[in-house]
């Protein structure tokens, strides 16, 4: 069976430990943030990668967890949604949430992060300030 966006909100929310009642109360907010509107009842198999990312991000950031892991979540989708998502991440920082942000976009890392780790083949090759690590990254990608 192929689940719709709406059904995936409940499935993903359950995996994250949210109750059905809580998700019922937050459903409209999730759909609104995701901007999926008329597509929310379409099977997710028909979603673009950006639409899937919007849905997952909207559920994952519904409440401020202590730690949030975002793996390339902002690498897809349109600029407007990325900007809105970056603002959401910044507001989470302001509330003390730790975000592990995985990205190949140096611009995003510079905008969102205050520390960085550079991995190569699963090994840490640089860590520290954004300035220090970005210099190593830029040298490696020349």
Model-derived features with residue positions:
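A short, surface-exposed alpha-helical micro-motif characterized by mixed small hydrophobic
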Residues: 109-111
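H-loop/switch region of ABC-family ATPase nucleotide-binding domains
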Residues: 103-104
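ABC ATPase "signature
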Residues: 127-128
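Helical segment within the ABC ATPase nucleotide-binding domain
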Residues: 82-95
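Conserved ABC ATPase "signature" region
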Residues: 10, 22-39, 58
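Conserved ABC ATPase "signature" C-loop
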Residues: 121-122, 137
């Amino acid at each position: 069976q192929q689940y719709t966006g709406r059904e995936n909100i409940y499935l993903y929310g359950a995996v994250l430990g949210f109750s059905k009642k809580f998700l019922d109360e937050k459903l409209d907010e999730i759909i609104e943030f995701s901007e999926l509107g008329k597509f929310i009842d379409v099977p997710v198999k028909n979603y673009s990668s950006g639409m899937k990312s919007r849905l997952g991000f909207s559920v994952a950031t519904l409440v401020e967890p202590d730690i949030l892991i975002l793996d390339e979540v902002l690498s897809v989708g349109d600029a407007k949604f990325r900007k809105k998502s970056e603002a959401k991440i910044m507001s989470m920082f302001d509330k003390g949430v730790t975000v592990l942000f995985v990205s190949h976009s140096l611009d995003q890392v510079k905008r969102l992060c205050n520390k960085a780790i550079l991995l190569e083949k699963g090994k840490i090759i640089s860590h520290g300030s954004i300035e220090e690590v970005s210099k190593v990254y830029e040298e490696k990608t020349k």
